[in-house]
């Protein structure tokens, strides 16, 4: 029974880590589907749109520099939770925005989230899984990262088809309104996996290696 329980927990851990990879992929790919409609309805110039696109990369570069230090300071699980919360917060900041600054802020938050996830989730997997399972964990993380990019593209494709259908009606005002709704909806769709990642991160145990390093031997043994 103990073996079955441990196996079930490891599957749950892999699921949570996989959701982290999915969010990373969504961070990278989501703007591609939203950009044409954002450009058509936001009134932003080319330079501003370029910054909105690049802000996620800037946020990722910055957070990656400090992710390891933060993971050592506050723990792997807490940093995973915070990274998920940053992603969740970024969605309404972007989707409800009506100006340049909120868009950039939301994209920066997404980038910071992605940078943290890209460091702390593989680190957490390496410290929590057995040597025989680490390759599987890394593979699942990378596979779902790629799936996140593909999923973002599929969502963008769906809305492009819907926009084409509305365009055939010939009502310019309706088309403009739908394009505005489309890019916001593309971001809203990515909210549920972010929320699931946060919930999962709260439910998993802290890394036993981190607990040992903090002198919390009993807690570390319980987490094994």
For each of these PLM feature ranges, what is it?
Residues 1-224:
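Transmembrane-helix signature of 12-pass secondary carriers
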């Amino acid at each position: 029974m103990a073996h079955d329980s441990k196996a079930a927990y490891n599957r749950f851990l892999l699921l949570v880590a996989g959701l982290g990879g999915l969010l990373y992929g969504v961070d990278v790919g989501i703007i591609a589907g939203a950009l044409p409609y954002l450009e058509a309805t936001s009134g932003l110039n080319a330079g501003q749109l370029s910054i909105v696109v690049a802000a996620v990369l800037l946020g990722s570069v910055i957070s990656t520099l400090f992710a390891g230090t933060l993971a050592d300071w506050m723990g792997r699980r807490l940093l995973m939770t915070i990274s998920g919360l940053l992603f969740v917060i970024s969605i309404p900041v972007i989707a409800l925005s009506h100006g340049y600054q909120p868009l950039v802020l939301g994209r920066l938050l997404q980038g910071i989230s992605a940078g943290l996830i890209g460091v702390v989730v593989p680190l957490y997997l390496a410290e929590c899984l057995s040597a025989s399972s680490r390759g599987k964990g890394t593979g699942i993380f990378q596979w779902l990262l790629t799936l996140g990019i593909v999923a973002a593209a599929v969502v963008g494709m769906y809305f492009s088809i819907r926009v084409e259908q509305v365009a055939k009606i010939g009502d310019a005002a309706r088309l403009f309104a739908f394009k505005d709704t489309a890019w916001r909806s593309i971001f809203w769709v990515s909210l549920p996996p972010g929320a699931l990642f946060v919930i999962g991160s709260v439910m998993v145990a802290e890394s036993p290696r981190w607990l040992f390093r903090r002198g919390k031997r009993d807690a570390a043994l319980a987490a094994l």
